[in-house]
């Protein structure tokens, strides 16, 4: 969490942006030497300098430097205030925070909320996780922290919510205070958790613990009587001093008062303790003196006024003439370096002797490395400053830097690593840049931005690079810490000059910081590296001896056993590693002599250097070394701790190769740290993958998991608030703001002037301003708006800067894929876990939010087709009748104006009375002033959220490092790129790898290698070749004259440190190796395997150099070169070699320049060249292939060969081929280089160079073809020669191609001639092309079909029996119809003839004859007869008999309703009894906005101020409230465009008609007063009709007595509703208010709806049977009731559904009492009702309710009847007939009418007595009489299997069997057990169980028990 002191308005001017200061991931030293800088000034680009700074600060700095902490991070809130003032404001903020904690919806506060950020927000808990500590930290808990690592203590305290509460107490026990000090000191000793420590110290700095408890404790020491306690005080005093030293270093300004008070008390306490005999350690007194010196120094600075903020840097003065210590040097360039051409102090890298000391060694490499990236920037800026007066500055090029003009810092953005900023620059000077390949603005590049000629400047690095954005001039930058502090005062309108240096700054930064942090004594191998002692010791871990097992390294382990002697072989395979005689043979290890020597050397020397010329197996030997070490890890590991092997490679590709080799012998415990891996095998070992594994997340310590949850929650909250404000800020750059958002920043006089419009002036024409934003009219952006007749001055009307850039042509998608150079470089730059910083938001969501925000804020948007208008869509065309070109021009003008820098000053603005009198240029200047104030205010509001998010992101980065530390500590092999090793140097210090292997060591700068090593390193193995590529340096002077390009590998070789060189090359055939030996390597022997290579096919020589003198072309951007002649030749040669049947994977094209790379790509379509690799030479070191085609590119009259003169590059280029190499270049020019001259001489001696390459045809060896240019390859079009192939194909034809070496057997050749084969006896020939397979003859011939005798045309190859006769079948089916199939087919089973049948519903319908029988047996048929029943609404039913369920459930009426709704729209829904709310877009609008809701929803009232004003009256109400001013009747004084007076009124929109020009239209009589000469008119805005004002006033204000409908007034002419007119606003608003009341009634009040919703929920819950039988429907209704925003209509639908479903459920439940045979038919009818009820509907129409009620009533009667009829078989005669007649009515398919119901009811009443519900065949009265007469309790009545009733007396339990007198079945039972076939007759007495049963014995029939008692 961030320090929570207030963010005050005062901005620090120091420390400056160019201060060395901390970068992300480090804390700078407190003591800095700034001797080069002048005294402190107010320039933000300069340093404070402290003179006479006391010396003791240096030692204290060492601990902070080693820790990598930045004491100034997060302390941005003490600016310009004393501690007392800060404390007061903190208290005020804490009060505010407590108030805010009680408020809900905190996350919805806008980003400009002034409330203090809620620091103590508790993150949500996951199930099963322990809750965060929210109570005071207890003694036991603090004691437990003392047992933990410092890192865990720091993170736990920073995450704990109880720390602040703990330190807020004003008194505590001494023992508790002492424990707190111990814990705090331990937390501050952590080396990698700087942000957590800063947070803890921030809480301590603002606590009563510091202000009250500690002083009281120190004073109490003086009077302590107990000797034992006094003797403990020195230790606690040491803790307090250490804490104070940390505190004053981090918060020098805000903590000084409390710290100085404590420091003044401590000497007195120490003297008192000393006087009482307590020993005080000398170190304690020294530390106290250091802090006293710091306090004294700070007090002096405070008196001078220079100590105002916590970002003040403590600096140390050096003795006069002393060289500035490199540890105090800033990494970034300083003000003096940029403005004064001072030569820095540099020492060359010593390559021929030893260094004076380790300090000098580190100093030398630090200065050289820093100068390598600073010098280009420094010299570039100096040249730029000298060129400022140059008129062609934008076109001028600078060698050292790239310049970007008019860069604007637009808005902050949240990323995973912190805050980044979107920066936009001018792309016009960069039209020719190909951003996909350009090295401009690559990830990690450093940029310097200034807006005042570099008097002050900001530093940033590129954090994200998308070439699509770069084309628009947009890049994301991450500013360094000092620059972040200055960003508070930067506005989006500020224009910067941005300068880029090409160096990968992030790599420099990490290494430079590492060199500053490392202590001299911690540099390993100093005796060899610094003192250059040639004696190399054995590794320390082998001092006690070491026995190694080499068995896994051997292909045949038995050889190992043979090589050991006697008993030794029997005991174990381990041997003494120092006794080379015991080692396995080189043959057993598969090594040559030099490789064997290298392996022995590497395993026995602590510093092993292995040089491997090309092809000698460097990587192979390196893997053998790693395998040996891993196999014998017990020798160099400690049992209690794991130390991984660290493998460092220069490139990602080399790292992948090496780790894949290790994977062959080690499948687990590998970790890869570097750029994105292209290896599928290694992806599982990347940090990202390992970190995301579930098992790893589970094993993370709890304190890290808690911290992660807390920080993620806070990050999300800060991000949300920041994004809202940032989007607002960005919107201001994309259009013109609406005036209401600027009102706060416009003076009252200017606002009134702006909104009133211009006074009468002949130069103005009139429009209707109410339709548009007034500010658009004022800025000249309205089309029919106030437009000055005179053209404005300035570039507004010119085409300057308005031309649109032409888009570059698209790349062809059919070309081979070549990684863009920018991508290649970036891939090596980006550490995988660092990743390119991308905004956290998804673009889709971002765009949606931005669009909504822009719509609200902007009156005109640059990304919109039509400028913003508040008018409805109907008026859009009429209002903006501008041509497309004019709109485009208008947008360009706005774009230009928004990017202009000239702004009106406030003083100038105050002198303006009428803003409409300004010319257009001045208006834009004034607008930019208002805009700047708006932007500044918005920027100020989001600043605190930036700081909060940045702090949380830094805390999160620390947590990630802790996670990574856990991963790396568990690994056995850690692979890193050099950049990754520098970045993770602090973790490597913790991991402490004992063995470090550096691959490609000769390519790595020495400083990079040293920064990789930790003091724990005991074994360093360097593998490389200094005669190939050297390390690359930016500055040529430093590389050559200061030996910066000499790697540690090369330097150690040159100072005679022992090394082993691999002597046998296993790659190149001898002819190719001859180019390297002896020209580059004196003695490089060929391994026998390279003597067995086959000759290259199709070429007379395996090695050849083609000479030419065709000139190169220089590529403007990128300083690269290309040679079209060479590119065409190489591509043609490549295609020729493919024709020789070489695989694409066997050929690689190399070139020396990137420009040539993309020239080649354009010539290589993927169809032909898929799989061919194309690379630049530098990216191909370490690689090899069978055939290499090399293009050297350079060819010019000046003889410039560029880096082709560098031996190392020549070595790499000539050593990549295994079997064949073909090179093309200007050899005459290259021969001027001595090395090339010698190589060319060797080539000439062997006839391997010449102007033409001799091709040799494989098929005709005597035929040779000379090729010197691409067109010559046309002589060998198919890769052979020009002779025809003449091969006779299997088909008998001749091959039509030219001679071709591929496909010699012609198996793949496709002969395209017509096939001539005879297919049948009739002589028919094959119609196919020759290569196609012949098919059976398909020529049709007449044949007689044997089965039927018909004559048919049958394919020649088909027999008569197989052919299906195509004649119609003549057979007659059983139904009498003819068979419809063909003669050859089986006859149809079901006749398809259509016949008419009568359906069950009574209708006739055509059906298939074959289905008639099935229909008789119940097959359902959908009757399509139209229903045509007249519905309740009067319209005919649109359904069919089937869809209307045979008239029982009619379909909804589909006729249009056409009724007029209250909103004046016609109902769009089909005919219903009750119209639903209108679903069209609401048409209500005002001058400010338009309602976007549905018309039937309640409108949100406009709360903007009412704009109805004129010179005489002004309304002061809100827009939605009734106006409080009268209408004005003063005639309008404006002139129309025609020059005649306006016929309108003051303050009203001027009517478009003229009394003079259109007299007929104006004076046309409507109300009767239009022809009067003084008549005044009003134009309705909704329809544009004009009316005489007095008549229209009466019309609008009259209220007819007989008018009962609530509706809007309409235009008397066209009946369009009058919705928008300021003059009649009160009347319109009154009508709208009435309409809103009606809407609310329709929708229902929220309270009523909520109550009804709860009641329905309770009702639904009570319907248990419904839930049980119909769970799906129950759940649907339950979910519906859980929804929000339900209307009354919705609830009505749900209520009806519940009641209907409940009734149906009851009916379904009653079916148990119905005979089984009858249940299915009823269930079918119930399912039909359910099916119909489940249809989607907004409500039930009256017709639907009627149908549903009728059907449910029918089913209720039917179920009741069937229940009565369960025993109906006993009912005889007339009763059975009566039952049958009732069932006929109830089971018919037509609707159950009212008459049916009356008849059924009457018949059912008659049956009650004869057919009771009991089913006993007796009436209920008779049943009651029988039960009463027997006098037995419930549960005594039973029935036999056939349902005959009998009674068991006494206890009710069956004690004997008998027979039923009716049916002779067994009744009764024995031993109180009833016969299984008998059952309880509950219908007699309602009993639920027998009287004698377990249930009865436990519970009995409760009513019976009650009666018996």
From Swiss-Prot:
Compartments, record wording: Mitochondrion outer membrane; Cytoplasm, Stress granule
Compositional bias of kind Acidic residues: 802-813
Biased composition (Basic and acidic residues): 1-12, 76-107
List of residues binding Zn(2+): 1840, 1844, 1860, 1863
Zinc finger (NF-X1-type): 1291-1313, 1375-1393, 1433-1455, 1463-1480
Keyword Cytoplasm: yes
Alphabetized PROSITE patterns for the sequence: ZF_RZ
Pfam families for this protein: AAA_11, AAA_12, ZnF_RZ-type, ZNFX1
RZ-type ZnF: 1818-1889
Coiled coil start-end: 939-964, 1733-1764
Inducing or repressing factors: By interferons (IFNs). Expression is induced upon viral infection.
Origin: domain of life: Eukaryota
Entry's transmembrane regions: none
Residue spans of biased composition, Polar residues class: 113-122
Presence of keyword Membrane: yes
GO molecular function, one term: helicase activity
First-listed, main subcellular location of the protein, grouped into a coarse class: mitochondrion
SMART domains, per database record: ZnF_NFX (SM00438)
Family designation: Belongs to the ZNFX1 family.
Subunit: Interacts with MAVS.
Descriptive protein name: NFX1-type zinc finger-containing protein 1
Source lineage: Eukaryota, Metazoa, Chordata, Craniata, Vertebrata
Protein encoded by which gene: Znfx1
């Amino acid at each position: 969490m961030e320090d929570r002191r207030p963010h005050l308005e005062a901005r620090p001017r120091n420390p400056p942006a160019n201060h060395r200061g901390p970068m992300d991931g480090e804390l700078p030293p407190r003591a800095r030497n700034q001797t080069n800088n002048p005294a402190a000034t107010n320039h933000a680009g300069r340093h404070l300098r402290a003179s006479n700074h006391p010396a003791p600060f240096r030692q204290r700095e060492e601990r902070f430097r080693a820790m990598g902490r930045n004491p100034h991070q997060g302390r941005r809130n003490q600016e310009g205030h004393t501690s007392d003032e800060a404390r007061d404001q903190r208290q005020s903020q804490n009060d505010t925070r407590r108030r805010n904690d009680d408020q809900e919806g905190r996350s919805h506060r806008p980003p400009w909320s002034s409330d203090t950020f809620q620091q103590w927000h508790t993150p949500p808990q996951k199930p099963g996780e322990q809750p965060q500590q929210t109570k005071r930290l207890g003694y036991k808990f603090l004691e437990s922290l003392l047992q933990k690592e410092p890192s865990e203590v720091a993170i736990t305290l920073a995450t704990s919510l109880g720390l602040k509460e703990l330190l807020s107490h004003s008194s505590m026990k001494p023992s508790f205070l002492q424990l707190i000090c111990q814990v705090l000191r331990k937390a501050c000793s952590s080396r990698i958790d700087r942000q957590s420590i800063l947070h803890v110290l921030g809480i301590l700095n603002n606590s009563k613990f510091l202000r009250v408890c500690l002083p009281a404790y120190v004073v109490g020491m003086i009077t302590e009587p107990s000797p034992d306690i006094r003797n403990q005080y020195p230790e606690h005093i040491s803790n307090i001093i250490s804490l104070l030293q940390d505190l004053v270093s981090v918060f020098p300004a805000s903590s000084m008062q409390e710290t100085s008070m404590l420091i003044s008390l401590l000497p007195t306490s120490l003297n008192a303790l000393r006087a009482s005999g307590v020993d005080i350690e000398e170190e304690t007194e020294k530390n106290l003196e250091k802090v006293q010196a710091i306090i004294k120094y700070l007090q002096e600075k405070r008196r001078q006024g220079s100590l105002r903020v916590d970002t003040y840097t403590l600096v140390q003065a050096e003795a006069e003439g002393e060289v500035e210590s490199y540890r105090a040097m800033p990494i970034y360039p300083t003000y003096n370096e940029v403005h004064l051409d001072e030569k820095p102090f540099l020492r060359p890298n010593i390559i021929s002797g030893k260094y004076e000391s380790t300090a000098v060694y580190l100093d030398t490499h630090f200065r050289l490395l820093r100068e390598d990236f600073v010098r280009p920037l420094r010299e570039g800026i100096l040249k730029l400053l000298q060129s400022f007066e140059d008129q062609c500055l934008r076109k001028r090029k600078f060698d050292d830097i790239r310049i970007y003009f008019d860069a604007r810092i637009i808005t902050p953005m949240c990323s995973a690593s912190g805050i980044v900023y979107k920066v936009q620059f001018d792309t016009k000077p960069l039209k020719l840049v190909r951003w996909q390949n350009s090295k401009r603005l690559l990830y990690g590049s450093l940029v310097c931005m200034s807006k005042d000629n570099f008097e002050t400047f900001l530093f940033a690095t590129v954090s994200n690079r998308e070439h699509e954005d770069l084309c628009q001039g947009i890049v994301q930058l991450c500013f360094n810490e000092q620059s972040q502090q200055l960003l508070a005062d930067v506005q989006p309108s500020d224009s910067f000059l941005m300068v880029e240096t090409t160096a990968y700054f992030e790599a420099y930064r990490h290494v430079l910081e590492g060199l500053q942090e490392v202590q001299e004594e911690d540099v390993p191998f100093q005796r060899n590296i610094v003192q250059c002692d040639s004696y190399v010791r054995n590794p320390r871990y082998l001092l006690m001896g070491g026995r190694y097992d080499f068995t896994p390294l051997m292909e045949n382990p038995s050889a190992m056993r043979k090589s050991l002697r006697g008993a030794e072989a029997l005991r174990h395979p381990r041997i003494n590693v120092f006794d080379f005689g015991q080692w396995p043979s080189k043959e057993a290890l598969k090594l040559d002599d030099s490789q064997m020597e290298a392996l022995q050397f590497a395993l026995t020397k602590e510093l092993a250097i292995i040089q491997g010329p090309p092809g000698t197996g460097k990587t192979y030997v390196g893997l053998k070394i790693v395998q040996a070490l891993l196999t014998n890890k017990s020798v160099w590991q400690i049992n209690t701790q794991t130390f991984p092997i660290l493998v460092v490679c220069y490139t990602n590709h080399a790292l992948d190769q090496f780790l894949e080799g290790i994977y062959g012998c080690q499948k687990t415990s590998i970790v890869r740290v570097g750029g994105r891996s292209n290896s599928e095998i290694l992806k599982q070992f990347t940090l990202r993958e390992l970190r995301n594994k579930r098992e790893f997340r589970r094993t993370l310590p709890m304190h890290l998991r808690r911290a992660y949850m807390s920080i993620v929650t806070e990050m999300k909250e800060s991000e949300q608030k920041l994004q809202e404000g940032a989007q607002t800020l960005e919107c201001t750059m994309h259009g013109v703001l609406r005036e209401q958002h600027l009102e706060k920043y416009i003076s009252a006089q200017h606002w009134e002037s702006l909104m009133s419009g211009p006074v009468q002036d002949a130069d103005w024409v009139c429009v209707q301003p109410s339709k548009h934003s007034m500010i658009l009219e004022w800025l000249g952006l309205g089309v029919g708006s106030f437009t000055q007749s005179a053209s404005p001055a300035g570039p507004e009307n010119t085409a300057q800067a308005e031309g649109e850039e032409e888009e570059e042509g698209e790349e062809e998608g059919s070309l081979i894929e070549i990684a863009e150079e920018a991508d290649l470089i970036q891939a090596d730059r980006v550490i995988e876990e660092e990743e390119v910083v991308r905004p956290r938001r998804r673009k889709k969501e971002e765009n949606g939010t931005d669009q909504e925000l822009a719509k609200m804020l902007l009156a005109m948007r640059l990304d919109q087709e039509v400028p913003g208008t508040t008018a409805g869509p109907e008026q859009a065309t009429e209002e903006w009748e501008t041509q497309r070109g004019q709109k485009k021009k208008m947008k360009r003008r706005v774009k230009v104006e928004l990017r202009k820098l000239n702004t009106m000053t406030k003083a100038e603005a105050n002198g303006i009375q009428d803003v409409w009198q300004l010319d257009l240029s001045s208006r834009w200047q004034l607008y930019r002033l208002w805009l700047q104030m708006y932007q500044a205010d918005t920027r100020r509001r989001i600043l605190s959220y930036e700081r909060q998010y940045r702090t949380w992101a830094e805390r999160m980065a620390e947590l990630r490092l802790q996670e990574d530390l856990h991963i790396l500590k568990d690994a056995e092999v850690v692979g890193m790129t050099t950049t990754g090793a520098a970045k993770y140097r602090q973790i490597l210090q913790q991991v402490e790898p004992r063995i470090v292997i550096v691959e490609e060591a000769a390519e790595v700068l020495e400083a990079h290698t040293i920064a990789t090593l930790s003091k724990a390193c005991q074994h360093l193995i360097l593998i490389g070749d200094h005669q190939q590529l050297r390390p690359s340096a930016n500055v040529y002077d430093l590389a050559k004259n200061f030996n910066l390009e000499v790697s540690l590998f090369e330097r150690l070789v040159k100072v005679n440190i022992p090394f082993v060189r691999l002597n046998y090359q296993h790659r190149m055939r001898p002819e190719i190796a001859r180019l390297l030996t002896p020209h580059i390597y004196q003695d490089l022997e060929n391994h026998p395997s390279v003597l067995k290579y086959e000759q290259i096919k199709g070429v007379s020589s395996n090695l050849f150099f083609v000479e030419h003198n065709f000139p190169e072309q220089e590529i403007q951007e990128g300083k690269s070169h290309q040679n079209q002649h060479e590119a065409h030749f190489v591509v043609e040669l490549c295609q020729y070699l493919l024709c020789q049947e070489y695989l694409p994977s066997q050929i690689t094209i190399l070139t020396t320049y990137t420009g040539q790379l993309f020239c080649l790509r354009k010539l290589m379509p993927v169809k032909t060249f898929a799989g061919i690799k194309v690379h630049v030479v530098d990216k191909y070191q370490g690689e090899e292939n069978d055939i290499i085609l090399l293009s050297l590119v350079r060819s010019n009259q000046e003889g410039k060969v560029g880096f082709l003169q560098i031996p190392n590059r020549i070595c790499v280029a000539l050593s990549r081929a295994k079997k064949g190499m073909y090179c093309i270049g200007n050899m005459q020019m290259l021969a001027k280089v001595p090395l090339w001259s010698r190589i060319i001489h060797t080539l000439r001696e062997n006839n391997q160079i010449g102007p033409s390459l001799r091709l040799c045809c494989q098929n005709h060896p005597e035929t040779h073809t000379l090729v010197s240019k691409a067109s010559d390859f046309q002589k060998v079009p198919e890769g052979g020669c020009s002779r025809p192939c003449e091969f006779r194909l299997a088909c008998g034809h001749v091959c039509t191609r030219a001679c071709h070496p591929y496909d010699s057997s012609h198996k793949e050749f496709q002969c395209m001639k017509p096939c001539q084969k005879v297919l049948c006896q009739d002589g028919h020939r094959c119609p196919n092309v020759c290569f196609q397979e012949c098919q059976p003859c398909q020529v049709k011939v007449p044949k007689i079909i044997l089965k039927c005798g018909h004559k048919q045309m049958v394919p020649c190859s088909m027999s008569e029996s197989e052919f299906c006769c195509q004649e119609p079948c003549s057979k007659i089916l059983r139904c009498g119809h003819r068979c419809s199939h063909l003669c050859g087919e089986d006859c149809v089973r079901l006749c398809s003839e259509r016949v008419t049948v009568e359906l069950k519903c009574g209708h006739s319908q055509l059906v298939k004859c074959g289905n008639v029988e099935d229909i008789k047996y119940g097959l359902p048929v959908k009757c399509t007869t139209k229903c045509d029943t007249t519905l309740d609404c009067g319209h005919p039913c649109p359904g069919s008999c089937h869809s209307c369920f045979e008239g029982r459930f009619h379909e909804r009426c589909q006729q249009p309703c056409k009724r007029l709704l209250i909103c004046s729209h016609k109902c769009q829904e089909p005919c219903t009894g009750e119209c639903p709310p209108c679903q069209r877009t609401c048409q209500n609008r005002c001058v400010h906005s338009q309602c976007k809701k549905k018309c039937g929803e309640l409108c949100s009232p406009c709360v903007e101020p009412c704009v109805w004003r004129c010179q005489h009256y002004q309304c002061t109400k809100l827009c939605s409230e009734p106006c409080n001013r009268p209408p004005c009747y003063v005639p309008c004084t404006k002139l129309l465009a025609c020059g005649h007076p306006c016929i309108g009124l003051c303050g009203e929109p001027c009517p478009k008609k003229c009394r003079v020009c259109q007299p007929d239209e104006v004076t046309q009589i409507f109300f009767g007063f239009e022809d009067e000469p003084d008549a005044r008119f009003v134009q309705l805005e909704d329809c544009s009709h004009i009316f005489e004002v007095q008549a229209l006033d009466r019309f609008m204000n009259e209220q007819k007595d007989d008018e009962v409908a609530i509706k809007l007034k309409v235009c008397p002419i066209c009946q369009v509703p009058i919705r928008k007119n300021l003059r009649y606003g009160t009347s319109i608003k009154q009508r709208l208010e009435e309409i809103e009341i009606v809407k609310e009634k329709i929708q229902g009040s929220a309270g009523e709806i909520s109550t009804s919703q709860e009641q329905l929920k309770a009702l639904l819950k009570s319907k248990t049977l419904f839930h049980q039988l119909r769970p799906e429907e129950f759940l649907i209704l339950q979910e519906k009731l859980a929804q929000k925003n339900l209307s009354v209509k919705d609830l009505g639908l749900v209520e009806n559904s519940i009641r209907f479903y409940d009734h149906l459920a009851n009916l379904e439940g009653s079916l148990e009492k119905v005979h089984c045979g009858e249940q299915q038919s009823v269930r079918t009818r119930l399912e039909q009702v359910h099916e119909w009820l489940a249809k989607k509907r907004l409500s039930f129409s009256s017709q639907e309710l009627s149908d549903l009620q009728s059907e449910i009533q029918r089913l209720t009667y039917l179920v009741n009847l069937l229940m009565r009829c369960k025993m109906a078989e006993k009912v005889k005669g007339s009763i059975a007939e009566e039952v049958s007649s009732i069932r006929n009515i109830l089971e018919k398919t037509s609707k159950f009418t009212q008459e049916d119901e009356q008849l059924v009811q009457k018949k059912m009443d008659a049956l009650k007595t004869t057919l009771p519900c009991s089913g006993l065949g007796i009436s209920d009265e008779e049943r009651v009489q029988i039960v009463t007469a027997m006098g037995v309790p419930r549960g005594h009545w039973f029935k036999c299997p056939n349902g005959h009733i009998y009674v068991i007396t006494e206890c009710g339990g069956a004690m004997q069997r008998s027979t039923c007198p009716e049916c002779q079945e067994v009744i009764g039972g024995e031993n109180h057990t009833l016969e299984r076939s008998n059952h309880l007759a509950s219908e007699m007495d309602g009993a639920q169980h027998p009287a004698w049963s377990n249930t009865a014995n436990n519970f009995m029939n409760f009513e019976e028990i009650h009666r018996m008692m």
